[in-house]
Regions:
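Active-site loop->helix "elbow" adjoining a glycine-rich segment at hydrolase catalytic centers
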Residues: 134-136
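Conserved HGGG/HGGXW glycine-rich cap/lid loop of the alpha/beta-hydrolase fold
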Residues: 48-102
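Alpha-helical elements of Rossmann-like donor-binding domains used by nucleotide-donor carbohydrate transfer enzymes
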Residues: 38, 75, 79, 111-118
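Alpha/beta-hydrolase fold catalytic core
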Residues: 1-63, 86-88, 125
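Active-site loop/oxyanion-hole signature of alpha/beta-hydrolase fold enzymes
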Residues: 92-131
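Detector for Asparagine
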Residues: 6, 36, 72-75, 95, ...
Length: 136
């Protein structure tokens, strides 16, 4: 497992908030947000700042939607993600080195899986459902 930074919230140049506390993240109600209205947030894991969005009803297992190789968190159709969010929490993310996430894009599927597991850990989530397509 990788460690995440425990920084205090701060506003970044883009106007999005760096979210530091996984305990708070796993108990926050994201039901007010939709795919396009949810703020893009960031969590740092081993020097990589991962961009993600969380929205939907915080009931049951959250679903983490993994991206294809160079896809970003806006590649999923909002009509689909918003429909999923009516019954559960949805988490969209950019892979390392893609979109708003920093670092280098992993060269292997194993590397992508490690990054996804590290992000899930950093968000304080014990159990999730995963959904992906292509290399996601």
């Amino acid at each position: 497992m990788r460690s995440h930074s425990n920084q205090s919230p701060e506003m970044l140049e883009t106007g999005t908030e760096l979210m530091p506390d996984p305990a708070e993240l796993s108990t926050t109600d994201y039901s007010e947000h939709t795919h396009n209205a949810a703020p893009t947030r960031f969590v740092e894991v081993d020097g990589i700042r991962f961009a993600y969005r969380r929205f939907g009803k915080p009931m049951g297992e959250p679903i983490v939607l993994l991206q294809h190789f160079m896809g970003n968190l806006d590649n999923y159709d909002p009509a689909i993600t918003d429909a999923l969010a009516m019954g559960r929490e949805v988490i969209l993310t950019d892979n390392a080195g893609v979109g708003l996430s920093t670092g280098e894009a992993p060269e292997t599927v194993v590397g992508m899986a490690r990054d996804a597991a590290s992000l899930i850990d950093a968000l304080g989530l014990e159990y999730v459902d995963l959904f992906g397509f292509s290399m996601g």
